[in-house]
Amino acid sequence: VSNFQIGDIESLLETAEIKPMVNQILLHISNTPMELVEYCQKNGIAVEAYSPIAHGEILNQPEIKAMADKYGVTVPQLCIRYTLQLGTITLPKTGNPDHMKSNAEVDFEINAEDMEILKNFKKIESYGESGIFPVYGGKM
């Protein structure tokens, strides 16, 4: 399923013959619906994080850049590692072979204190040109 909230999943589970295996959701630093992630994980539903780099808008956040520098990685690498440490399947989008290679180089660990900071990072209010989706673009 995609973009199912807890109520949606509960309704589906009442009638479905086969439980969903994956819930693909928008998940990144500044949009971390932990209650939904924990619900899915508790119920054996994998969470797939699409747009872990926040449609590119996270690249404009100096606090995130500073944390990436602390770990000696790029902002996209920090973002991807963050979603992996949450126990999600991460789906970064790129057509650039260099970015693909870099996106796979996430063999570091974000410490617990920094994970909490990232979980509670201020919400990005606009995804710019990528904000065409009414719900996530703040248009509803």
Can you name each region flagged by the protein language model?
Residues V1-M140:
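Beta/alpha (TIM)-barrel catalytic core signal, keyed to glycine-rich beta->alpha loops juxtaposed to Asp/Glu
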